Regions:
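Active-site phosphate-binding strand-loop segment of PLP-dependent enzymes
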Residues: 10-82
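A generic structural signal for well-ordered alpha-helical segments
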Residues: 60, 176-177, 209
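Aromatic/hydrophobic pocket-lining residues that form π-stacking "cages" and hydrophobic walls in ligand
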Residues: 56, 87, 205
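Conserved glycine-rich beta-strand-loop-beta hairpin in the small C-terminal domain of fold type I
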Residues: 148, 164-173, 183-196, 223-226
């Protein structure tokens, strides 16, 4: 259909953030019509600040680029003091954005196939509905009921889950940074750890991990062949086994 995409890389410093110079350059291209954002960011786990969202809004609005913000991990903020700001809540983004959310990541109900889009602008909402017709399935009754229950009746469970995941994240962070050749930054959010394995000096870091009996998500899927992603949304016993294998 003639469409194409360009990837905006994340920039590593004290934390990961977007390469705003690259975003500004790509948005200035008249062919650019849509910026797809992931916030919290997957796989690096950063939560964008209001200043960063304001910069995104400035770039998108100046170039008439729509924003589609995937915020499926927004209820998995692990770092104390960090706050998720929905793109559609920002006045300078509301009329130019589509915000995608679901209970599936936080409450483990992905199999029910239920998500939702928040689109304040009526014209944009109608265009989204028209484009989705015949492609995107309607939600099921069970999925709708489960989503409502998750967001209205599970606060105590959710808080316990965040505590558990925070402990798992810290375990991964402390262990990985003590394994020769591996390093990582502490994720603000999600149940995913982005591991820099460039220090191993091996040709294939995925093979290195698999030979130790660990099957992480390949970094090449995220344009970083010398990295891999670990899911720490599991039992502590399983996570300890994973980390022991990597350290062996």
């Amino acid at each position: 259909d003639g469409t194409s995409s360009e990837t905006i890389s994340s920039v590593e410093g004290a934390r990961y953030t977007l390469d705003f110079e690259a975003l500004e350059r790509e948005a200035a291209d008249p062919k650019c019509k849509l910026f797809i954002l992931c916030n919290p960011m997957n796989p690096v786990g950063s939560v964008l600040t209001k200043a960063e969202l304001d910069r995104i809004a400035e770039i998108c609005n100046a170039n008439n680029v729509k924003l589609c913000s995937d915020e499926i991990h927004c209820d998995l903020i692990l770092e104390e003091g960090k706050q998720h700001i929905p793109a559609g809540r920002e006045s300078n983004l509301a009329e130019n954005s589509v915000t995608l959310m679901a209970a599936s990541k936080t409450f483990n109900i992905a199999g029910l196939g239920t998500s939702f889009a928040i689109i304040p602008n009526r014209q944009l909402r109608q265009a989204f509905t028209n484009a989705a017709a015949g492609i995107v399935p309607w939600v099921t009754v069970l999925g709708l009921a489960a989503t409502k229950a998750a967001f209205t009746q599970c606060d105590e469970w959710h808080q316990q889950q965040l505590t558990y995941l925070r402990e798992n994240r810290d375990m991964v962070f402390n262990t990985v940074n003590n394994i020769d050749g591996l390093k990582m930054l502490k994720a603000d959010a999600t149940f995913l750890a982005w591991v820099d394995a460039s220090g191993l000096g091996v040709e294939n870091v995925q093979q290195w991990a698999e030979e130790k009996g660990v099957g992480p998500s390949p970094g090449i899927d995220f344009h970083k062949a010398d990295h891999f992603r670990i899911n720490f949304g599991c039992s502590k016993a399983m996570l300890q086994d994973i980390l022991q294998r990597l350290a062996s």
